[in-house]
């Protein structure tokens, strides 16, 4: 898939506006735990462009390093998502409490520039918003493009489309499903190591009787995946399910999803099984392993993800 363009030329833009870094309250990135909030400051650059500084922990309990010494690409995806929420709240005035509904999310990580050291990694996330539609003076939908630099080197790019809805509109849209509820897994996890995890509590898949198909496990007490009461399965949990399914179908060789593209079609509900299926596909280039992952619930497509990563030996 194509990478997002590099959006901000830091050298040419450095003197165009007053450069004052602004702090990031956790509410603006929809997190309640400081260890799960990655943007730390932001600067408006003008013309629907922003620069966000983010820090990546080297020892996050959920977004742990992959393949021994690389930052998890899904940690990058989550950082991009938080940077987008930040600029729409702080830069455009979308009220806190509005729902941030992502329809697509694509990313490309350059693993050579995402090595893990003994300290936090500081990233500069360039954010550009486009195709904005406004209602009542604030955006209701748009496209976001990101370019991530670490020590001046391009470490990742991404693009997404998203919508924003008020609590009132969201409740009407969700109807009987709008009430947050709890979910406790009633099925055993697949072995953590086979799913690319080290802890059973982070495994979101259970075995099924069908080949290369697993049942989604949802535990609303998970401290990272569920920061607050929710009425549906979060998109980042679905991305994690896709990653784990890719690990299972490509194992025993490790799978690192350095490239990902996801289309979210409908909500995954708590009250019905969601089935995750993975298929190895021809890769976009030599040396890459590609997996197509789908989620279905009650016979309908919930999401479609394509993940690619370096072909490692087992």
From Swiss-Prot:
InterPro entries: AfsA-like, AfsA_hotdog_dom, HotDog_dom_sf. It catalyses: a medium-chain 3-oxoacyl-[ACP] + dihydroxyacetone phosphate = a (4-alkanoyl-5-oxo-2,5-dihydrofuran-3-yl)methyl phosphate + holo-[ACP] + H2O. The keyword Transferase applies. It is an enzyme of class 2 (transferase). It comes from the Bacteria. Pfam families: AfsA. Keywords: Transferase. Changing residue 243 to K: Cannot produce active gamma-butyrolactones. Disruption phenotype: Deletion of the gene leads to a strong perturbation in the expression of three pigmented antibiotic clusters. It also affects the secondary metabolite cluster responsible for synthesis of the siderophore desferrioxamine and expression of the genes encoding enzymes for primary metabolism pathways, which supply antibiotic precursors and genes for morphological differentiation. One of its GO terms (molecular function) is transferase activity. The keyword Repressor does not apply. Its EC number is 2.3.1.277. Belongs to the AfsA family. Involved of the biosynthesis of S.coelicolor butanolide 1 (SCB1), a gamma-butyrolactone that triggers antibiotic production. This is 2-oxo-3-(phosphooxy)propyl 3-oxoalkanoate synthase. It comes from Streptomyces coelicolor (strain ATCC BAA-471 / A3(2) / M145). The gene is scbA.
């Amino acid at each position: 898939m194509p990478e997002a363009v590099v959006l901000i030329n830091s050298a040419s833009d450095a003197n165009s506006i007053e450069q004052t870094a602004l702090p990031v309250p956790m509410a603006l990135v929809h997190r309640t735990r400081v260890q799960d909030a990655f943007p730390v400051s932001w600067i408006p650059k003008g013309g629907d462009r922003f620069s966000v500084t983010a820090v990546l922990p080297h020892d996050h309990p959920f977004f742990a390093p992959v393949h021994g010494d690389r930052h998890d690409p899904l940690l990058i995806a989550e950082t991009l998502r938080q940077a987008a929420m930040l600029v729409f709240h702080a830069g455009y005035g979308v009220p806190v409490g509005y729902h941030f509904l992502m329809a697509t999310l694509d990313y490309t990580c350059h693993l050579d520039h995402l090595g893990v050291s003994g300290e936090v990694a500081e990233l500069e996330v360039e954010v550009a918003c486009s195709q904005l539609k406004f209602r009542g003076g604030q955006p209701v939908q748009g496209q976001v493009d990101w370019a991530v630099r670490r020590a001046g080197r391009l470490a990742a790019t991404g693009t997404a489309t998203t919508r924003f809805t008020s609590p009132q509109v969201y409740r009407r849209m969700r109807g009987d499903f709008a009430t947050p509820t709890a979910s406790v897994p009633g099925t055993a996890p697949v072995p953590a190591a086979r799913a690319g995890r080290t802890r059973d509590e982070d495994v979101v898949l259970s075995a099924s009787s069908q080949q290369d198909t697993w049942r989604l496990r949802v535990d609303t007490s998970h401290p990272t995946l569920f920061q607050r009461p929710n009425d549906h399965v979060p998109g980042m949990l679905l991305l994690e399910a896709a990653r784990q399914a890719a690990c299972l179908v490509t194992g025993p060789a490790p799978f690192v999803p350095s490239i990902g593209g996801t289309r979210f079609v409908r909500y995954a509900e708590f009250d019905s099984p969601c089935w995750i299926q993975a298929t190895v596909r021809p890769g976009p280039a030599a040396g890459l392993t590609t997996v197509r992952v789908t989620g279905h619930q009650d016979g309908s497509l919930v999401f479609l993800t394509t993940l690619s990563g370096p072909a490692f030996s087992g």
